[in-house]
Amino acid sequence: MENTRASLMFKTLAVAAIGLSATFVMLVRDPSDTLFGGGYPELWRRTGLAGAPTRAAACIFAGVFLLAMGWLYRLLFAPLELLRGVDEVGYIAEDGRSRAQAANEVRRRRKTGELPPVYPNGWYRVLDSHMLERGDVKSVTVLGQQVAVFRGQDGKAYVVDAYCPHLGANLAVGGRVVGGCIECPFHGWQFRGVDGRCVKIPYADKVPEFAKVRCWPSCEINGLVLVWFHCDGLEPSWRVPEQSQITRGEWVYRGRTEHFINAHIEEIPENAADIAHLAHLHTPGIVSGVDLRYTNSKTWEFIRHDWKVEWKPEPEPNKHCSQMLVKHALTVFGRHWPLLDLDVLARQVGPGVVFLLFEHSFLGRGVIMHCVTPVEPLLQCVSHTIFYQSSIPPLVPKFILRAECIQFERDVMIWNNKTYISKPMLVKEDSAIQKHRRWFSQFYSENSPRLRYQHDTLDF
Ligand code: FES
Ligand SMILES: [Fe+2]
């Protein structure tokens, strides 16, 4: 609603600007006008060039004005979309190597260590709801598998295996939504989203019972399309809770970021229990950037973030959840700015979803949905989607998301280049890490897939 109003205002301003510029250009006919107060040279008059410089200047001015308006509109109203490529963050590309070369080298050379299983049981995000319109089909890789995500004409989102069981065409590449079904682009078989059953074979009299595509248990909540994975095919044993402010439309979408991380999935949530790293990695002000070679530079020393953190698992019946309570304070030139104190509750629900709930006296309330989805055994897609009180100017949540993204990218540089240590050398103050590992182990079961070879990954 608010976005529609803003966009209407912008369109009105743009039309007014174009109208004014056009009028101005048309009015510039007289050679004795603006630029040449004393009249044009005779030659210009004869060749018909009189008035042209002013008209050109007016056109350039109108163009620049429109560009500036567009930029201002995006800054003030449009959601922040920060989508990082697989090799874009956290690698050091030196000696003339490209970022992709640096990333591939790190992946090839890395010692993976003794890893836990690579795909824990749980709910994982496949897409944000707004990315899937009615009738859309998207191809997504989750947990090493290709899936087709589509939204039926009934408005429901469905997730099925991408490869058609008939002859293997990819349903997400050229497939078409027909009612609540997806139609294969190769021979036109139609599969129902609800249960994967084939309901139509255009050239056959009868559809055999066994004609079926695998259908993933899925749900749509808090603006996310999620799938359930269990290595033994068991049904979901818990649900991702609803954030009612999102459903009621009180908190609205203000942007998202996406990163690909070259690490085992468990490294990412373990960060919440690694309390000591906050005081080291995340203390330098966000102005000092994300490249860990420079974040401790003297130039930005005057601005520091202070963190007080506590991590604990939740008791039954929510033992699949854990909580990190964060108290953030900002100091500038050693002076604490209480107005910028921020409390965050990070509630992890299963291995793949975290609710980062913000509460601030005047900056308002909102949530960042932090989702980790394994793409391959050692490649995680991490998305942060922010929903914020609709009454707060979008610039505020966009700034929060951007700031969070800077801190997160520092972790990315660590994760992308580290190895997993199954028996780490810990001190007493690191005890939450072991607790976290015990808590996280509930998402593995005997048949959870393991990494077979160190190079069980693809090059970027
Ligand atoms: S491969 Fe899909 S219908 Fe033939
Ligand atoms: Fe961190």
Swiss-Prot record:
SUPFAM superfamilies to which the protein is assigned, alphabetical: Bet v1-like, ISP domain
GO cellular component assignments: cytoplasm; membrane
Location(s) in or outside the cell: Membrane
Binding positions for [2Fe-2S] cluster per the UniProt entry: 164, 166, 184, 187
Cofactor: binding comment: Binds 1 [2Fe-2S] cluster per subunit.
Main location: membrane
Catalytic reaction annotation: cholesterol + NADPH + O2 + H(+) = 7-dehydrocholesterol + NADP(+) + 2 H2O; cholesterol + NADH + O2 + H(+) = 7-dehydrocholesterol + NAD(+) + 2 H2O
UniProt KW Iron keyword: yes
Listed transmembrane segments: 8-28, 60-80
Role of this protein: Catalyzes the production of 7-dehydrocholesterol (7-DHC or cholesta-5,7-dien-3beta-ol) by inserting a double bond (desaturating) at the C7-C8 single bond of cholesterol. This reaction is the first step in the synthesis of the steroid hormone Delta(7)-dafachronic acid.
UniProt organism field: Danio rerio (Zebrafish)
Topology relative to the membrane: Multi-pass membrane protein
EC number: 1.14.19.21
GO biological process: cholesterol metabolic process
Keyword tags: 2Fe-2S, Iron, Iron-sulfur, Membrane, Metal-binding, Oxidoreductase, Transmembrane, Transmembrane helix
The keyword Kinase is assigned to this record: no
Cofactor: [2Fe-2S] cluster
Domain Rieske: 123-227
Designated name of the protein: Cholesterol 7-desaturase nvd
Family, per entry: Belongs to the cholesterol 7-desaturase family.
GO molecular function, one term: cholesterol 7-desaturase (NAD(P)H) activity
